Amino acid sequence: MKVILLEELEGRGSFGDIITVKDGFANNYLIPRKLALPATEGNIKHIQSILSQKARKLEKIRTQAQELAKKLDGAEITIKKPVGQNGKLFGAITTSDIAKALNEKGFNVDKKQIIISSPIKNLGLYTIKVRLHNDIYASIKVNVEEQK
């Protein structure tokens, strides 16, 4: 029996794939658990329309990420924190602090998109990467200054 997968099945396929399985497997397992639909013409057209909508949506998100990357690339933000002796910060600057500073400048960036290897604990200028999409990155400069 031919079925259209509604979820990824390990070793079988992913969403929208049309696969051939035994009738019992389809009728007793895949279809009742809503993991697949019978591969009728109507179902195939329905899944194709869903796939095309997803593709358009992903392309729109990708385009928005590219536009944001152009605006964000090379941007510089300044974060002021209290400092102890030897230029060490009280606490550290984390992705949350950087995201907050970027949002204040008008860039809509989530803290999960900011990539730093470890929290910033010293004064200085740092180059930080921001992951906006699967393969779209922007570099920003974070200037850490003493709060007076």
Swiss-Prot record:
UniProtKB keywords: Ribonucleoprotein, Ribosomal protein, RNA-binding, rRNA-binding
Biological processes annotated in GO: translation
UniProt entry tagged with the keyword RNA-binding: yes
Pfam family, one: Ribosomal_L9_N
InterPro entries in alphabetical order: Ribosomal_bL9, Ribosomal_bL9/RNase_H1_N, Ribosomal_bL9_bac/chp, Ribosomal_bL9_C, Ribosomal_bL9_C_sf, Ribosomal_bL9_N, Ribosomal_bL9_N_sf
Any one of the GO CC terms: ribonucleoprotein complex
This protein's record includes keyword Ribonucleoprotein: yes
NCBIfam families: L9
Role: Binds to the 23S rRNA.
Record's protein name: Large ribosomal subunit protein bL9
Gene: rplI
